[in-house]
Amino acid sequence: MKLDLFVYNSQHFVNNITLYQLNHLNSTSFSFIFLSGLFTSLSPCIISILPVCILYIAGETQKLNPINKTKNLFLFCLGTISSFITLGILATLITKTYSQFFNGIPTISAVVIIYMGLNLLNIVHINSPKFNGLVTNNNYNFKMYLSGVGIGIAISSCSTPIFVTLLVWINSTQKIFTGLIFILIYSIGYIFPIIIGSIFSTSFLKLTESLSGIIMAPSVELCY
């Protein structure tokens, strides 16, 4: 079985178990939601973007001191989690056809990832005086948070099946507070590889390069 087909089938299997857990809430439901987020993150979609996230958090030179790296990681993850929660609230309030709501996100994802890559290469910058002043005055914190928001929007399209299941459950049960806690836990599990990768940035970047090569190989073969 090809890797991409295995990942697809596995995600749908986890999605079915998640739906069962949501309909039969117990003490293990919260931990399973975290594990479902973690499992969903182990896909080519997330692995391919990990190096960009790690470079933003740990710095291009990998020489940030532990305090600054921890601060960057916190702000980046805060931005990512807040984007997930915001998307969940908007999708629940605006529409019940969640697939239509997420249709435009892949395009937004591509734009965000391309911009962040070009920004890391110092090719593209935002030349707004107000934006630059805001970033400078807050010692880079706002830019790090905003980067997390952008990545959160970008990777949300990779988590559609289980994320939509959570949104449908929230809408059908009207347990909004519990649902938001589930989205919070799910998003933490979903970005857990980014957290681990940032802590062990040097070793993790080498690992993701190897994994990206293995994952991209079947796609290259299809071109011939």
From Swiss-Prot:
<dbReference type="GO" id="GO:0017004">
    <property type="term" value="P:cytochrome complex assembly"/>
</dbReference>
<feature type="transmembrane region" description="Helical">
    <location>
        <begin position="150"/>
        <end position="170"/>
    </location>
</feature>
<protein>
    <recommendedName>
        <fullName>Putative cytochrome c-type biogenesis protein DbsD-like</fullName>
    </recommendedName>
</protein>
<keyword id="KW-0150">Chloroplast</keyword>
<keyword id="KW-0472">Membrane</keyword>
<comment type="function">
    <text>Could be involved in cytochrome c synthesis.</text>
</comment>
<keyword id="KW-1133">Transmembrane helix</keyword>
<dbReference type="Pfam" id="PF02683">
    <property type="entry name" value="DsbD_TM"/>
</dbReference>
<keyword id="KW-0201">Cytochrome c-type biogenesis</keyword>
<feature type="transmembrane region" description="Helical">
    <location>
        <begin position="176"/>
        <end position="196"/>
    </location>
</feature>
<feature type="transmembrane region" description="Helical">
    <location>
        <begin position="104"/>
        <end position="124"/>
    </location>
</feature>
<dbReference type="InterPro" id="IPR051790">
    <property type="entry name" value="Cytochrome_c-biogenesis_DsbD"/>
</dbReference>
<dbReference type="GO" id="GO:0031969">
    <property type="term" value="C:chloroplast membrane"/>
</dbReference>
<keyword id="KW-0812">Transmembrane</keyword>
<keyword id="KW-0934">Plastid</keyword>
<feature type="transmembrane region" description="Helical">
    <location>
        <begin position="74"/>
        <end position="94"/>
    </location>
</feature>
<dbReference type="InterPro" id="IPR003834">
    <property type="entry name" value="Cyt_c_assmbl_TM_dom"/>
</dbReference>
<feature type="transmembrane region" description="Helical">
    <location>
        <begin position="32"/>
        <end position="52"/>
    </location>
</feature>
<comment type="similarity">
    <text>Belongs to the DsbD family.</text>
</comment>
